[in-house]
UniProtKB/Swiss-Prot annotation:
Contains mostly 4-hydroxyproline. Proline residues at the third position of the tripeptide repeating unit (G-X-Y) are hydroxylated in some or all of the chains. Residues 307-316 have a biased composition (Gly residues). This is Collagen alpha-1(I) chain. The modification 3-hydroxyproline is found at P692, P969, P984, P987, P990. Pfam families: Collagen (PF01391). Residues 1-997 are annotated as: Disordered. Type I collagen is a member of group I collagen (fibrillar forming collagen). Trimers of one alpha 2(I) and two alpha 1(I) chains. Glycans are attached at K88, K913. The modification Phosphoserine is found at S94, S594.
Length: 997
């Protein structure tokens, strides 16, 4: 059959998991390529600032260290092995026959027909419209595996419920058509029930009026399958009877033999590449490559100017590494030279003495860019180059997020009392004091005389509605009322609508025969009646004995060509026959359509180095690749020497507070990511027009397998082709595994000081963290030594007023201070009278004997309130009494109104310097202040003296795989493969069904 046109390519799905195939062998190391030079990628976004830690002590500025040796070039990862072919999906179950529709309304009952002969078995009805199952998630398209033996087709199972649509699978290469499974044998057809006995033909009555349409009859139950009768002789083909109800499914047929492998279908046209799918999970990490040969040392860079010395930053959580910028375009690679013969390894010579640095050569004119060389095999990893001069220190990092307050320290021991200070100058007279607290309630006074009754007050406002009262008890049931008088007969109602016709009732039992009537008179002769119905065919007689075989008759004339018979049911697949004898090698077939792209082969040995071609035009800069996933944080390197302190930059303006972000807990250290899958194919070039598919040729007889061809000799070396157009910048490759740590190189010559770098941009404002819980109080620390007095620092900007802190515990009572001198302030206004004080002690008795106690007098009337006397002059201050014990702290009184601000007093004399107190315990962290924006970078200081070379830092851990790059341009179309060997002959097909007579 002619294959239909290939449909459009589906969307690219998720890449499948790596196949369990074995790891491929590592190819031979190639020659080292020319070092590429690309523009520096953009700076990644800054990571989240870390938590502020305690300020460390400022160390003495050290000399700037030399730039450490560059890390070894990682070996190129091994190409991932092609995954095993995905398992062939099992053939979906055939949908069950659709449910039988409800029976239509029963028509008027016709005359009973004569029972027909058993007709020939009807054709198999069309497959019912079973619910089509949704396609499941497509598995990953792996490389085509060997065709397995086709399993026997099982019986059709029930159609399961449609699952949710899965994610679209990746569109793999079009696989070859697998062998067609054998069709399972159909179950036996259910036995058709025998027709019931015909009823007696009644006399044909006069044709009546057509009756009304009957109600739809109830759906009859499916009859039980009748017992299979003995097969009768085929009778005359009667009219097809109505289709009976579907019988129960037959028993499961025997599994068919494996089907013969189908012929290979024509290769469809290559579909357009689908969109780039989501990156799949990283494959397993390849084996660590061998250490490459030592590369040539790179050119010595110029030492950058030392940057400003940053203030001691607070140590916080390490911020997440910024996303790596896109890799610059790779430099053009020269054509590889011819590989020389491999020499025997020589003995390692002693390193020679370092020569004097040569004079700096003149700057040559830039050469024209060479043509794009073919990508050679990956070169071996170079050894560590000489360490370059130290680069300029980075700009000062952004302020970290305010950290959570530390744990509450333990209560410290109270400090020693300080020395008594020199009395200060007299303060100004303060404002009038607040009202004193009410004194204790005095004893009850004598009862006064009864007052006169006052006038009646005004009427009060109406009260609010009361709440509903509780529910009362249930009342007693009343007596039944007397029966009422019957009412008048109502008017007749309208006639109702005619009801629907009811279902026919069951047939009643036949009644007893009535008495015989009188014999009627003979009627007039009637007209000739209508012809009677055709009688029922008689029952088929028993089969007679077979007669003697007659003589063979003469051959009759050739009949007309019969109609083509219907396709017979596919027979069971026969067993595979033995391979036929080896035939002569067939002629070479015509070039077939290009086959699907095969899996990527192992990298071949490096070819001979071609002659350099003419320089091609410079290509345009490609678009930056997609940002890769952030790599894992490398292990911290050795601390370098501290640089000289630069001049402090001006303070930046305070920015608005940023939103408060939740500080996430540091995640667990991720496992080492495996090498990612190779990048997807690039954007397709201008596709040629696809010609119409030619007619499919008839499959020829399978020939014997041809002899194995000999390996051809090496072809002549091809001429160097013209320079190709510059390719687009490819995606950044996955980072290779870190190589072994190389030995530190020799010190390079000191370079000239570089120009000062550009002023950095102000960083983004950090996120203010939430204040943490108050920690427990720590143990008191040992008193530290008395430090030298610090220099007067610049006055800081006044901060915003913080929230009032919690009230502390009452302090110990201090020694009473000396009374100050009277200030020059004006006399304050007299205060209000205080509450009466407690009753004083009884005075001493005077001379004379005590008199007899008098009788208690009647209580006198309450006298008028006395006038308050003039305020006396303030007496001299008495000597300070001894300090009494600290009383218990009373309850906090209500906060009074804020008093007026008093006049500023004269500045007191400076007291003597007290001894330095003990170092206090660290208090709980205050609320986080809003961090200021990063100030502009200060001017670069002069280059410091060259410091000793620092130790090489430990190589960082492998970064995570980057996102897959954009799809590259399609590769050249592969040449048409030679015709393969002819396969063994297939098994003979099953015999077809006999045609119609």
């Amino acid at each position: 059959s002619v294959p239909g046109p290939m449909g459009p390519s589906g969307p690219r799905g998720l890449p499948g998991p790596p196949g369990p195939g074995p790891q491929g062998f590592q190819g031979p190391p190639g020659e080292p390529g020319e070092p590429g030079s690309g523009p520096m990628g953009p700076r990644g976004p800054p990571g989240p600032p870390g938590k502020n830690g305690d300020d460390g002590e400022a160390g003495k500025p050290g000399r700037p260290g030399e730039r450490g040796p560059p890390g070894p070039q990682g070996a190129r990862g091994l190409p991932g092995t092609a995954g095993l072919p995905g398992m062939k999906g099992h053939r979906g179950f055939s949908g069950l026959d659709g449910a039988k529709g409800d029976a239509g309304p029963a028509g008027p009952k016709g005359e009973p027909g004569s029972p027909g002969e058993n007709g020939a078995p009807g054709q198999m009805g069309p497959r019912g419209p079973g619910e089509r199952g949704r396609p499941g998630a497509s598995g990953p398209a792996g490389a085509r595996g060997n065709d397995g033996a086709t399993g026997a087709a099982g019986p059709p199972g029930p159609t399961g419920p449609a699952g949710p649509p899965g994610f679209p699978g990746a569109v793999g290469a079009k696989g070859e058509a697998g062998p067609q499974g054998a069709r399972g044998s159909e179950g036996p057809q259910g036995v058709r029930g025998e027709p019931g006995p015909p009823g007696p033909a009644g006399a044909a009555g006069p044709a009546g009026n057509p009756g009304a349409d009957g109600q739809p009859g109830a759906k009859g139950a499916n009859g039980a399958p009748g017992i299979a009768g003995a097969p009768g002789f085929p009778g005359a083909r009667g009219p097809s009877g109505p289709q009976g109800p579907s019988g129960p499914p037959g028993p499961k047929g025997n599994s068919g033999e494996p089907g013969a492998p189908g012929s290979k279908g024509d290769t469809g046209a290559k579909g357009e590449p689908g969109p780039t799918g989501i990156q799949g999970p990283p494959g397993p990490a390849g084996e660590e490559g061998k250490r490459g040969a030592r590369g040539e040392p790179g050119p010595t860079g110029l030492p950058g100017p030392p940057g400003e010395r940053g203030g001691p930053g607070s140590r916080g959580f390490p911020g997440a590494d910024g996303v790596a910028g896109p890799k610059g375009p790779a430099g053009e690679r020269g054509s590889p030279g011819p590989a020389g013969p491999k020499g025997s390894p020589g003995e390692a010579g002693r390193p020679g003495e370092a020569g004097l640095p040569g004079a700096k050569g003149l700057t040559g004119s830039p050469g024209s860019p060479g043509p794009d060389g073919k990508t050679g095999p990956p070169g071996p990893a170079g050894q560590d180059g000489r360490p370059g001069p130290p680069g300029p220190p980075g700009a000062r990092g952004q302020a970290g997020v305010m950290g959570f307050p530390g744990p509450k320290g333990a209560a410290g021991e109270p400090g020693k009392a300080g020395e008594r200070g020199v009395p200060g100058p007299p303060g100004a007279v303060g404002p009038a004091g607040k009202d004193g607290e009410a004194g204790a309630q005095g004893p009850p006074g004598p009862a006064g005389p009864a007052g006169e009754r006052g006038e009646q007050g005004p009427a009060g406002s109406p009260g609010f509605q009361g709440l509903p009262g509780p529910a009362g008890p249930p009342g007693e049931a009343g007596k039944p009322g007397e029966q009422g008088v019957p009412g008048d007969l109502g008017a007749p109602g309208p006639s109702g609508a005619r009801g629907e016709r009811g279902f026919p009732g069951e047939r009643g039992v036949q009644g007893p025969p009535g008495p015989a009537g009188p014999r009627g008179s003979n009627g007039a002769p009637g007209s000739q009646g209508a012809p009677g119905l055709q009688g029922m065919p008689g029952e088929r007689g028993a089969a007679g004995l077979p007669g003697p075989k007659g003589d063979r008759g003469d051959a009759g004339p050739k009949g007309a060509d019969g109609a083509p018979g219907k396709d017979g049911v596919r027979g069971l697949t026969g067993p595979i026959g033995p391979p036929g004898p080896a035939g002569a090698p067939g002629d070479k077939g015509e070039s077939g359509p290009s086959g699907p792209a095969g899996p990527t082969g192992a990298r071949g040995a490096p070819g001979d180095r071609g002659e350099p071609g003419p320089p091609g035009p410079a290509g345009f800069a490609g678009p930056p690749g997609a940002d890769g996933q952030p790599g894992a944080k490398g292990e911290p390197g050795d601390a370098g020497a501290k640089g000289d302190a630069g001049p402090p930059g001006p303070a930046g303006p305070t920015g608005p507070p940023g939103p408060i972000g939740n500080l996430g807990a540091p995640g667990p250290k991720g496992a080492r990511g495996s090498a990612g899958p190779p990048g997807a194919t690039g954007f397709p070039g201008a596709a040629g027009r696809v010609g119409p598919p030619g007619p499919s040729g008839n499959a020829g007889p399978p020939g014997p397998p041809g002899p194995v061809g000999k390996e051809g000799g090496k072809g002549p070396r091809g001429e160097t082709g013209p320079a190709g157009r510059p390719g687009e910048v490819g995606p950044p490759g996955p980072p290779g595994p870190s190589g072994e740590k190389g030995s530190p190189g020799a010190d390079g010559p000191a370079g000239a000081p570089g120009t000062p770098g550009p002023q950095g941009i102000s960083g983004q404002r950090g996120v203010v963290g939430l204040p943490g819980q108050r920690g427990e109080r720590g143990f008191p620390g040992l008193p530290g030594p008395s430090g030298e007095p610090g220099k007067q620092g610049p006055s800081g900007s006044s901060g915003e007023r913080g929230p009032p802190g919690p009230m502390g515990p009452p302090g110990l009572a201090g020694p009473p201070g000396e009374s100050g001198r009277e200030g020059p302030g004006a006399e304050g206004s007299p205060g209000r009278d205080g509450s009466p004080g407690p009753k004083g002690d009884r005075g001493e008795t005077g001379p004379g004997p005590p008199g007899a106690p008098g009788a208690p007098g009647a209580p006198g009337p309450v006298g008028p309130a006395g006038k308050s006397g003039d305020r006396g002059e303030t007496g001299p201050a008495g000597p300070a009494g001894p300090a009494g014990p600290a009383g218990a702290r009373g309850p906090a009184g209500p906060q009074g109104p804020r008093g007026d601000k008093g006049e500023t007093g004269e500045q007191g004399d400076r007291g003597i310097k007290g001894h330095r107190g003990f170092s206090g315990l660290q208090g709980p962290a205050g609320p986080p202040g809003s961090p200021g924006e990063q100030g502009p970078s200060g001017a670069s200081g002069p280059a410091g003296p060259r410091g000793p070379p620092g130790s090489a830092g430990s190589p960082g851990k492998d970064g995570l795989n980057g996102l897959p790059g954009p799809i590259g341009p399609p590769g050249p179309r592969g040449r048409t493969g030679d015709a393969g060997p002819v396969g063994p002959p297939g098994p003979p097909g099953p015999p077809g069904p006999p045609g119609p007579p």
